[in-house]
Amino acid sequence: MAELEAVIEQKLIEQLIYGDSQWIYRNDLKTEEDLWNNFRYILEQNNKERLNGDHLSDSEFEQVKNQLQFSSFYKAGEWLVGENGKVMVHVQRDTERLHLVVMNHEHIAGGSSVYEVINQYRALADEDSRQNRRFDVTLMINGLPLIHIELKNKQHSYMDGFWQIKKYIGEGKFTGIFSAV
Protein backbone atom coordinates (compact mmCIF):
# COMPACT_ATOMS: atom_id res chain seq x y z
CA MET A 1 0.00 0.00 0.00
CA ALA A 2 1.34 3.41 -0.95
CA GLU A 3 1.99 5.98 1.73
CA LEU A 4 -0.50 8.80 2.03
CA GLU A 5 0.78 12.12 0.74
CA ALA A 6 -0.02 13.68 4.13
CA VAL A 7 2.39 11.23 5.78
CA ILE A 8 5.11 12.02 3.23
CA GLU A 9 4.50 15.73 3.83
CA GLN A 10 4.84 15.31 7.58
CA LYS A 11 8.05 13.29 7.19
CA LEU A 12 9.55 16.01 4.97
CA ILE A 13 8.71 18.71 7.50
CA GLU A 14 10.11 16.62 10.37
CA GLN A 15 13.34 16.09 8.41
CA LEU A 16 13.67 19.81 7.70
CA ILE A 17 13.21 20.87 11.33
CA TYR A 18 15.09 17.93 12.91
CA GLY A 19 17.91 18.54 15.38
CA ASP A 20 20.03 21.64 14.97
CA SER A 21 18.31 22.61 11.74
CA GLN A 22 17.61 26.29 11.21
CA TRP A 23 14.22 25.53 9.65
CA ILE A 24 11.20 26.42 11.80
CA TYR A 25 7.77 24.93 11.19
CA ARG A 26 5.10 27.66 11.12
CA ASN A 27 1.67 26.05 11.25
CA ASP A 28 0.21 29.43 12.26
CA LEU A 29 0.74 30.97 8.80
CA LYS A 30 -2.34 30.03 6.78
CA THR A 31 -3.45 33.14 4.87
CA GLU A 32 -1.80 35.66 2.55
CA GLU A 33 -2.30 38.31 5.22
CA ASP A 34 -0.47 36.07 7.74
CA LEU A 35 2.42 35.70 5.29
CA TRP A 36 2.67 39.44 4.57
CA ASN A 37 2.58 40.23 8.32
CA ASN A 38 5.32 37.66 8.96
CA PHE A 39 7.45 39.05 6.12
CA ARG A 40 6.95 42.59 7.41
CA TYR A 41 8.00 41.61 10.93
CA ILE A 42 11.20 39.91 9.69
CA LEU A 43 12.01 42.81 7.34
CA GLU A 44 11.65 45.29 10.22
CA GLN A 45 13.73 43.12 12.59
CA ASN A 46 16.53 42.75 10.04
CA ASN A 47 16.56 46.49 9.30
CA LYS A 48 16.11 48.07 12.76
CA GLU A 49 19.13 50.30 12.30
CA ARG A 50 18.11 51.47 8.82
CA LEU A 51 14.59 52.18 10.12
CA ASN A 52 15.95 54.04 13.18
CA GLY A 53 13.98 51.65 15.38
CA ASP A 54 10.67 52.68 13.78
CA HIS A 55 8.16 50.37 12.15
CA LEU A 56 7.20 50.65 8.51
CA SER A 57 4.00 52.61 8.06
CA ASP A 58 1.21 50.92 6.11
CA SER A 59 1.91 53.12 3.08
CA GLU A 60 5.63 52.32 3.28
CA PHE A 61 4.87 48.61 3.43
CA GLU A 62 2.60 48.99 0.39
CA GLN A 63 5.68 50.31 -1.44
CA VAL A 64 7.51 47.12 -0.43
CA LYS A 65 4.63 44.90 -1.53
CA ASN A 66 4.49 46.64 -4.90
CA GLN A 67 8.18 45.87 -5.46
CA LEU A 68 7.52 42.20 -4.76
CA GLN A 69 4.95 41.80 -7.56
CA PHE A 70 7.07 40.04 -10.18
CA SER A 71 5.68 39.62 -13.69
CA SER A 72 7.72 36.47 -14.31
CA PHE A 73 9.92 33.96 -12.53
CA TYR A 74 12.83 35.43 -14.49
CA LYS A 75 12.19 38.90 -13.03
CA ALA A 76 11.99 37.37 -9.55
CA GLY A 77 15.28 35.55 -10.16
CA GLU A 78 16.98 38.75 -11.30
CA TRP A 79 15.86 40.48 -8.12
CA LEU A 80 16.96 37.55 -5.93
CA VAL A 81 20.50 37.76 -7.32
CA GLY A 82 20.69 41.16 -5.67
CA GLU A 83 23.48 43.69 -5.85
CA ASN A 84 26.74 43.21 -3.99
CA GLY A 85 25.31 40.15 -2.25
CA LYS A 86 22.22 41.92 -0.92
CA VAL A 87 18.61 41.65 -2.04
CA MET A 88 16.96 44.99 -1.34
CA VAL A 89 13.68 46.87 -1.41
CA HIS A 90 13.49 50.65 -1.35
CA VAL A 91 11.06 52.82 0.59
CA GLN A 92 10.47 56.54 0.34
CA ARG A 93 10.05 57.96 3.86
CA ASP A 94 9.38 61.68 3.75
CA THR A 95 12.49 63.10 2.04
CA GLU A 96 14.65 60.05 2.72
CA ARG A 97 15.00 56.92 0.56
CA LEU A 98 15.51 53.84 2.73
CA HIS A 99 17.32 50.80 1.34
CA LEU A 100 16.09 47.74 3.25
CA VAL A 101 17.83 44.37 3.09
CA VAL A 102 15.48 41.46 2.38
CA MET A 103 18.29 38.89 2.11
CA ASN A 104 22.00 39.10 2.62
CA HIS A 105 23.91 36.41 0.72
CA GLU A 106 26.63 36.53 3.39
CA HIS A 107 24.06 35.36 5.95
CA ILE A 108 23.12 32.14 4.18
CA ALA A 109 22.80 29.36 6.77
CA GLY A 110 23.14 31.82 9.62
CA GLY A 111 23.35 35.46 10.51
CA SER A 112 20.07 37.31 10.13
CA SER A 113 18.46 34.72 7.84
CA VAL A 114 15.20 33.15 9.00
CA TYR A 115 14.20 29.77 7.51
CA GLU A 116 10.55 28.75 7.79
CA VAL A 117 8.39 25.90 6.49
CA ILE A 118 4.64 26.09 5.94
CA ASN A 119 2.24 23.49 4.63
CA GLN A 120 -1.31 23.26 3.38
CA TYR A 121 -1.43 26.95 2.51
CA ARG A 122 -4.79 27.70 0.94
CA ALA A 123 -4.62 29.76 -2.26
CA LEU A 124 -8.11 31.17 -2.60
CA ALA A 125 -10.22 31.28 -5.73
CA ASP A 126 -10.25 34.55 -7.62
CA GLU A 127 -11.36 35.92 -10.99
CA ASP A 128 -8.65 33.93 -12.82
CA SER A 129 -9.24 30.66 -11.00
CA ARG A 130 -12.54 29.64 -9.54
CA GLN A 131 -11.02 26.92 -7.38
CA ASN A 132 -9.27 27.06 -4.06
CA ARG A 133 -5.93 25.24 -4.06
CA ARG A 134 -3.83 23.84 -1.24
CA PHE A 135 -0.06 23.98 -1.55
CA ASP A 136 1.69 20.97 -0.02
CA VAL A 137 4.93 22.46 1.37
CA THR A 138 6.48 25.90 0.94
CA LEU A 139 9.95 26.91 2.09
CA MET A 140 10.47 30.55 3.04
CA ILE A 141 13.61 32.57 3.62
CA ASN A 142 13.18 35.76 5.66
CA GLY A 143 9.42 35.38 5.35
CA LEU A 144 9.40 35.24 1.56
CA PRO A 145 8.08 32.04 -0.07
CA LEU A 146 10.82 30.86 -2.44
CA ILE A 147 10.41 27.10 -2.91
CA HIS A 148 7.15 25.27 -3.55
CA ILE A 149 6.94 21.47 -3.27
CA GLU A 150 4.06 19.26 -4.40
CA LEU A 151 4.54 15.77 -3.02
CA LYS A 152 3.39 12.53 -4.63
CA ASN A 153 3.32 8.98 -3.34
CA LYS A 154 4.54 5.93 -5.28
CA GLN A 155 1.17 5.57 -7.00
CA HIS A 156 1.71 8.90 -8.77
CA SER A 157 4.59 9.97 -10.97
CA TYR A 158 6.73 12.89 -9.86
CA MET A 159 5.58 14.44 -13.15
CA ASP A 160 2.08 14.70 -11.63
CA GLY A 161 3.55 17.16 -9.13
CA PHE A 162 5.22 19.05 -11.97
CA TRP A 163 1.95 19.28 -13.92
CA GLN A 164 0.12 20.34 -10.77
CA ILE A 165 2.54 23.24 -10.31
CA LYS A 166 2.15 24.15 -14.01
CA LYS A 167 -1.62 24.21 -13.47
CA TYR A 168 -1.21 26.54 -10.49
CA ILE A 169 0.97 28.83 -12.62
CA GLY A 170 -1.71 28.88 -15.32
CA GLU A 171 -4.33 29.72 -12.71
CA GLY A 172 -2.26 32.64 -11.41
CA LYS A 173 -1.68 31.13 -7.96
CA PHE A 174 1.97 32.27 -7.78
CA THR A 175 1.24 35.96 -7.44
CA GLY A 176 1.44 38.41 -4.57
CA ILE A 177 3.80 37.18 -1.91
CA PHE A 178 4.21 33.94 -3.90
CA SER A 179 5.47 35.69 -7.04
CA ALA A 180 9.12 35.02 -6.11
CA VAL A 181 8.60 31.23 -5.97
Q: Where in this protein do the model-derived segments appear?
A:
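An alpha-helical interface "stripe"
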Residues: M1-V181
